[in-house]
Amino acid sequence: MSPAPPPVTVSVDPDLTARDVRALLEAHLADMRAVSPPESVHALDLDELRDPAITFCVARTADGTLLGVGALKELDDPTEPGGHGEVKSMRTAPTAVRTGVASQLLAHLLDLARSRGLARVSLETGAEPFFAPARRFYARHGFVECGPFADYAPDPNSVFMTRPVAGSAAAPAAPPA
């Protein structure tokens, strides 16, 4: 049985200056670079996460302990009526794996997408075995495989996934893979 999820507050962190946030993102990038060829690493660094189209969020306990991070990037996608977002930089702190924190972060990102009227949220993750838990996690949360979106190109090291944003004004069916 998994431990009960800790009491968590998920909030927007616009400056990305906290040492623990930087360390978790650096570990995330190091893992991505260790398991994927350079041309297939699509994780964003700190500077890229400061893009105005990106809303970066943190999950913390009441005492301020960092449990995870994630971001929502609003895409300029004229083919998606109602708007399109991308989940980026989802990472759970090692001490919070399998506690429900990732689900809480993802729910917060989907709520942000809904509040902004986005119809669809997509993501890119790896095809390597290292990423199998991530693919299962996203599938449990309603994501299905799709083709490349936004600026992505077909890549044998990438898996693209998408889902409609429930409750948005326009939430069409998933595009074909």
Predicted regions and their residues:
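Residues forming the Rossmann-fold NAD(P)(H) cofactor-binding site
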Residues: 99, 103, 107
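Acetyl-CoA-dependent GNAT
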Residues: 5-88, 93, 106-108, 112, ...
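Conserved GNAT acetyl-CoA-binding A-motif
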Residues: 113-126
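Conserved beta-strand-loop-alpha-helix junction that forms the acyl-donor binding cleft
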Residues: 94, 123-134, 152-156
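Internal catalytic or translocation cores that form aromatic/hydrophobic pockets or channels
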Residues: 144-148, 155-157
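Active-site acidic-Proline motif in GNAT/NAT acetyltransferases
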Residues: 93-95, 99
